[in-house]
Amino acid sequence: GRCGCHGYKATAGWRFGNLIDGTQAEYVLVPDAQANLAPIPDGLSDEQVLMCPDIMSTGFKGAENANIRIGDTVVVFAQGPIGLCATAGARLMGATTIITVDGNDHRLGISKKMGADVTLNFNNCDVVDEIMKLTGGRGADASIEALGLQSTFESALRVLKPGGTLSSLGVYSSDLTIPLSAFAAGLGDNVRRWIWPCRD
């Protein structure tokens, strides 16, 4: 079959797209291709596998970093392609309840097909209040932020139960402000960021 990028777990890791230019090009030289590429089965079109190398792996890694366990309530903020894949990943990881947040009803409808149990349009309600009501005031076990805005990051933080896990996938254009009270609530060990990992 044809080959497609394996995603972040490939042994090249952070080098793809950061130290090796051109990974969005039609062709790219892949070091250690035997370990860093996975075959795409014959019979699948380019359109069917288009999101696998970057978008799907990013969304699924966000769900993996959220430490989701069976029985957990997970909130996924933003339902663009990466957020939708994070929603599917949360379902596959065993989340019992998945709440998705977006401002676009069409995307929220797709998120239902990807595994969401409850969808919230931020144009129609205060999503933090609504999520706290849905969780009986307890908060979510995990939240995944897939947009990259201060406001969505803050909301993802505010809906967590004490000690909950925030998995951040968004690319932020400026520095984030995180209230110190979040660390007092036990968040310090449970904020996980995947998109900009440290180099060795």
Predicted regions and their residues:
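Glycine-rich phosphate/adenylate-binding loop and adjacent beta-alpha elements
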Residues: G1-N36
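A generic alpha-to-beta junction signature in SAM-dependent methyltransferases
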Residues: A66-I68, T135, L147, V159-K161
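Glycine-rich phosphate-binding loop and adjacent beta-alpha segment
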Residues: A95, D117, F122, L149-D200
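Mid-domain Rossmann-like dinucleotide-binding core that forms the NAD(H)/NADP(H) cofactor-binding site
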Residues: P39-C125, D129, A142
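A glycine-rich helix->loop->beta "capping" turn
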Residues: L134-A142
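Short acidic active-site motifs
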Residues: D126-M132, S151-T152
